[in-house]
Structure formats: C-alpha cells, structure tokens
C-alpha cells in the first residue's frame, strides 16, 4: 500500500471517528471517492504522489462546515449553516448530510430555509423534491413554510394544482390554518388566468370557494384581496356580485382605491350599464382618484356608443389632463359618432385640439384621424 493511499485512508477514518463522514452521495463526497478510485486504479499512483488531485473549494467548504457542526447540533445550528451558503448545491449537501445523523431530524424551519435557498439558486428540481418530502410529512406543518411552497407552485404552470393540494392540507390542520398571505397568493394566481371570458367562468367558482372559506376561517381580507375578488366578478360580468363586495369593504375596515373603482367602471360599462359606470367615475373624481388608461377608454367608448357624446368628450379631455393618451380605437369611436350625429365640423376641431394636448398622438396618427373625419363627412 502506497504512502499516499495510507494518508487518504487515515484522513477518512479520522473523520469517521468524529462522526462527520456523510453517508450520502453529496457533491463533495463524490469528488473524494473519485480521488480514491484514481489512486487505487492507476499504477503510477504508487510512485507519483504529486498526481493526486487536490480538493476543490466546494469540498473544502463542505468539510469545514460539517466540522463546525459539532455532535449534538440543533436545528438552529443547521439553519445558520444553510443560510451562510451562497452555493445552493453546497447547502443541499449540508442539508442531506445532517438529516442522516443519529438523533437529529429537520424541522419546518430547516426545510423552509433550504427551500428558499434552492429557489434563490434556481434549483427547481431540488425544490420540487423538497416539497414532496414536506407534503409527505417529513417535518411538522408551518404556515410560513406552506406559504413559501404555495408561492413557488403558483409561479409554475404545471404545479398550479399542487398549490391547492397544499392549501387543502392547511385547511385540515389544527394549528396551521391558511392566513391572509395564503389567500392572497391563491387569488392572485387565479386572476392571472382570467384572460378570456369563457375561461373566467371556469375559475370564478374557485374564487367563490376561496372567498367563502376565507370568511369561515375568520381571515379578514384587506383592500388588495377584496380588489381581486371584485376584479374576478367584474371580468365575468357578474357586476352585482362585484358591487356587493364593494359595499362590504367598509365592514372589513378597508377603503376602496382607484383600482377598485376602475374594475367597477369597466365591469358595469361592459355589462351595458353605462350610466352606473359614469356614476362610479364621478365618485372617483370627487375622491381625487385617477382611473387607469383602460378604464378611461372603456368608459369613453361606452358613452360614445350610447350617443352621450358631450360626456364622452369631457372624459377624453380629463384623460388627457391626467397625462394619459387614448388609443386610436377610442379616438375613432368618438369621432365616428360625432360625424354620424351631424357634428363633423366639431369633430375636425377636436382632432386639432387633441393633437395639441396629446404628445403621443404624433403626425401620422393625426393625419389618419383627419382623413377618417373627412371621409365620414363626405359620406
């Protein structure tokens, strides 16, 4: 047996005597085992000790940290070690090694820390494996841990249903019930799928169920959550339900904001209740709130189609005064209805005025609008 091989075996046995040798196939241990095989299989190793590979920085860091974790280490010690790692692979090696030590078991805080480290390092496969371990009961339940899992699952298309599996497990627990953050994450994820009207109705049932369960669990929604519920109803044109939630906001100590009113204005206008939409818009003005661009444009087009042209023009000027620019469809809708109502010359004057107030319009769009008005007037 060569001197080099004896030194390596002595080093390994010393680590074992300290109960520090990891029994799993970590990155660092794999590298060390490779060096053993290269020594035993290469005939030159008996005569050339200089050919033995030096340890990588990852191996050195791993050995340093496991030596710092003295026998009898606690979950707090492991959490500190995990948080100190900038390399998620090294953190996972430490996490797996500590889990195999006699008398120790990871708690929810250790799993939470490791999952966050893996997410930060974009080790999504590691994260999914850890999540399955948690769901299988590898550690006790914890609201922060489960919310972290739900956040990750909601952000990944193929894990969307898994987020609700975790939520249902929280519902069945005695001491880890869903909190406001849980419902915020789930509702936000559902709302991202409200992109088409027929799809909206599919997910609206889930929104209703979450809302009922939130109330039954005694979770008080904030303005952000209530706005998401209002938005869900408004996008499905369930405007009476949206208005009901709007009126309940005061019961929860929440104040409606510009988003609340914008969702309501768009919803009732798309439902055909333009007068009610204008009423919400004026209520916003009284409170000093400014609608977003899409709210403005839906209201302008709805008023124009209802031949309430003076009110539509007034909203256009208010939109421009708030440094927001209508799109070409909105401009065309107003101008077309003006020309159809025999107010063609007024339409030409408005195009000139809008060009002065709208820096985004540009010369090309201005010419397009003027040509459209001339064409409509000739017809």
Curated annotation (Swiss-Prot):
Q: List the disulfide bonds.
A: none
What this protein is called in its record is: Pentatricopeptide repeat-containing protein At3g25210, mitochondrial
The residues forming the signal peptide are none
Q: Which UniProt keywords apply?
A: Mitochondrion, Repeat, Transit peptide
- Sorted alphabetically, which PANTHER family does this protein's record hold? OS06G0184866 PROTEIN, RESPIRATORY COMPLEX I CHAPERONE (CIA84), PUTATIVE (AFU_ORTHOLOGUE AFUA_2G06020)-RELATED
What is the native source organism of this protein? Arabidopsis thaliana
PROSITE patterns hit by this protein: PPR (PS51375)
Where is the protein found, in the record's own terms? Mitochondrion
Q: Which domain of life is it from?
A: Eukaryota
Which residues form the PPR repeats?
Answer: 142-177, 179-221, 222-256, 257-291, 292-326, 327-361
Q: What is its main location?
A: mitochondrion
Protein family per UniProt: Belongs to the PPR family. P subfamily.
* Gene Ontology annotations for the cellular component aspect, listed alphabetically: mitochondrion
Supply the InterPro entries for this chain.
Answer: Pentatricopeptide_rpt, TPR-like_helical_dom_sf
**Which taxonomic lineage does the organism of this UniProt entry have?**
Eukaryota, Viridiplantae, Streptophyta, Embryophyta, Tracheophyta
């Amino acid at each position: 047996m060569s001197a080099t091989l004896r030194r390596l075996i002595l080093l390994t046995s010393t680590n074992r005597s300290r109960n520090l040798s990891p029994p799993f196939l970590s990155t660092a241990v794999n590298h060390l085992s490779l060096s053993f095989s290269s020594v035993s299989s290469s005939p030159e190793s008996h005569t050339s000790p200089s050919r033995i590979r030096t340890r990588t920085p990852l191996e050195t860091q791993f050995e340093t940290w496991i030596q710092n974790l003295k026998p009898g280490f606690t979950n707090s010690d492991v959490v500190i070690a995990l948080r100190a790692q900038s390399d998620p692979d090294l953190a996972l090696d430490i996490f797996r090694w500590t889990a195999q030590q006699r008398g120790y078991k990871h708690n929810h805080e250790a799993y939470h820390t490791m999952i966050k480290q893996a997410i930060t390092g974009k080790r999504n496969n590691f994260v999914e494996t850890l999540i399955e371990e948690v769901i299988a009961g590898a550690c006790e339940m914890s609201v922060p841990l489960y919310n972290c899992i739900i956040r990750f699952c909601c952000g990944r298309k193929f894990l969307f249903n898994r987020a609700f599996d975790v939520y249902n497990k929280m519902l069945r627990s005695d001491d880890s019930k869903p909190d406001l953050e849980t419902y915020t994450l789930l509702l936000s994820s559902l709302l991202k799928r409200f992109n088409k009207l027929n799809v909206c109705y599919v997910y609206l049932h889930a929104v209703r169920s979450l809302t009922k369960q939130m109330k039954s669990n005694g979770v008080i929604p904030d303005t952000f959550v209530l706005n998401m519920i209002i938005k869900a109803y408004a996008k499905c044109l369930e405007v009476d339900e949206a208005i009901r939630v709007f009126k309940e906001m005061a019961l929860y100590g929440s104040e409606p904001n510009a988003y609340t009113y914008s969702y309501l204005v768009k919803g009732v206008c798309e439902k055909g209740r333009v007068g009610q939409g204008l009423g919400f818009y004026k209520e916003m003005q009284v409170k000093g709130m400014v609608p977003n661009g899409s709210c403005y444009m839906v209201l302008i087009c709805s008023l124009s189609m209802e031949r309430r042209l003076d009110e539509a023009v007034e909203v256009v000027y208010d939109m421009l005064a708030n440094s927001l620019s209508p799109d070409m469809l909105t401009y065309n809708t107003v101008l077309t209805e003006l020309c159809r109502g025999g107010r063609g010359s007024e339409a030409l004057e408005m195009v000139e005025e809008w060009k002065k107030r709208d820096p985004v319009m540009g010369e090309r769009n201005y010419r397009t609008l003027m040509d459209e008005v001339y064409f409509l007037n000739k017809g």
